[in-house]
Amino acid sequence: MAAKEKLEAVLNVALRVPSIMLLDVLYRWDVSSFFQQIQRSSLNNNPLFQYKYLALNMHYVGYILSVVLLTLPRQHLVQLYLYFVTALLLYAGHQISRDYVRSELESAYEGPMYLEPLSMNRFTTALIGQLVVCTLCSCVMKTKQIWLFSAHMLPLLARLCLVPLETIVIINKFAMIFTGLEVLYFLGSNLLVPYNLAKSAYRELVQVVEVYGLLALGMSLWNQLVVPVLFMVFWLVLFALQIYSYFSTRDQPASRERLLFLFLTSIAECCSTPYSLLGLVFTVSFVALGVLTLCKFYLQGYRAFMNDPAMNRGMTEGVTLLILAVQTGLIELQVVHRAFLLSIILFIVVASILQSMLEIADPIVLALGASRDKSLWKHFRAVSLCLFLLVFPAYMAYMICQFFHMDFWLLIIISSSILTSLQVLGTLFIYVLFMVEEFRKEPVENMDDVIYYVNGTYRLLEFVVALCVVAYGVSETIFGEWTVMGSMIIFIHSYYNVWLRAQLGWKSFLLRRDAVNKIKSLPVATQEQLEKHNDICAICYQDMKSAVITPCSHFFHAGCLKKWLYVQDTCPLCHCHLKNSSQLPGLGTEAAPQPPAGAEQNIVLQEGPEPPDHESPPGTGTQEGSGDSSEHINRGSASQEGAADAGEGPQIPEGEVCPVESA
């Protein structure tokens, strides 16, 4: 059953490719120039070419037929192709019969065939060919009435009966007319089939639109036609034909530089129409998806394909190529200029793929560094991929500077490549810190601050580079050629890569500064209080040799509570808000009210405390979230069962503000 479904899926794509190729040919065909050539040739007196408007209408009819063939259901499409194959077989039978009659006329032998070996060979060959044609037609049309397709065997039967050659010519014409009448009868009996199909399709479309809407109809057609795979196969067929036509006319092998130029020019030739450009877009998307999938497989093996929600990657690269092609008018350029521009666009796509590879590798590498996994092979794969992502973007930027004149798009490529290398450098630095901490007996103090400073340095460099790109783009727009699309790209780049990043970075800095001030304002627990409390930190589940006390009388490690406050300003246990006393109205400089001496030291909550890295603070990025992982907080975790002991004392309602005295 699976094999049948796969075969149907292959047929669903393969049978629709010719319709897109026909659309592509009709787009390339210039009817006006075609008729100008006809007027200058000897075909001008042909009645078929006297009616130009009829040919123009036939041009549009070709578009309609192509769209109909593209959207036909698979069952009807298969049936249509079977009818077409049957027509080809009948034409082949007609050709076999005509060639046989012509050969007999040239030989002028009218005697018994068994007395003439050449005549016998011709008869045997023609008979076998006609039998094969009749059998295939019967199988394709699924009928046992084989005589319907055997009219072209009449000249063979007449020759076997020693009929004169002049009469055999007449019999051959009769067989041709009989077969033509059969075809006309079949077409006439199915004349209303297209109308009925269109009527039923219209009724079904109206029902779907009324019930589900136009968006659901579009998604259904997209999935049924398998549009991405269909256009990718169409473009690959065009590209293969282009390569074949080149090598079939060349006798000498091409050099390496010539092969690279051939590759670019072939791609440029295969994106000269909107249909072929869409094919290139989907092909690039699938190539990017394949590269990113191989990247995950290299890092994680078969575990990469288990519950992977990000298998829709690759569309970013395809959309990028489409936007750049439309913005630069790619399909309107000459082949050489198109190949040059396409090389720049492909560089941008490669830079985007490298950035996506880094997005995949970054959390995996950091998680591997923070874990206790001793597998050298896993560490080798992670580090080798990071080294590749460190060296290759820098090499690509160097080659671009060597061979191209600098402009706005090349600056975007170079800046993206440099930022990718810098981000990989930061990832490797944090990975080395994790590995150093792994071999130490005690955790490294202020590790989260080091990670934050590393990420902050990278984010600052990224912000500066984005700002430089915007400044260069604005200057080029003002003093160079101004376009609406270019201005929109600069505006979008400024909003997402400059303004939003600046906001997130500043917000992250304020959160960390506020968390540090709050920790400094909390009292430090004495040794007597720790012995009396006799509990573990409710965040990292480790024994407390030093701790700070919240206004709600909860004990935490200062570092653990600081990480928690990076995310939210509530107590991890009772969830009351921790604010400075100066921020609360009516409190003035009075000391904050403290619970009674016998108040509970820990409160059993219905919800367990969330880890401090449960929600990544804005602007810190993936690396900081990985650095603040539970492996860093807890390097030999105790049992979670002792996280909180039930105690007696007043409950603090959730959401109540707990003032924190200013230091």
Curated annotation (Swiss-Prot):
One of its GO terms (molecular function) is zinc ion binding. InterPro entries: HRD1_E3_ubiq-ligases (IPR050731), RNF145_RING-H2 (IPR047823), TRC8_N_dom (IPR025754), Znf_RING (IPR001841), Znf_RING-CH (IPR011016), Znf_RING/FYVE/PHD (IPR013083). SUPFAM superfamilies: RING/U-box. Keywords: Endoplasmic reticulum, Membrane, Metal-binding, Transferase, Transmembrane, Transmembrane helix, Ubl conjugation pathway, Zinc, Zinc-finger. Disulfide bonds: none annotated. It is found in: Endoplasmic reticulum membrane. Residues 587-663 are annotated as: Disordered. Residues 619-628 have a biased composition (Polar residues). Interacts (via YLYF motif) with INSIG1 and INSIG2. PANTHER family: RING FINGER PROTEIN 145, RING ZINC FINGER PROTEIN. This is RING finger protein 145. It comes from Mus musculus. The lineage of its organism: Eukaryota, Metazoa, Chordata, Craniata, Vertebrata.
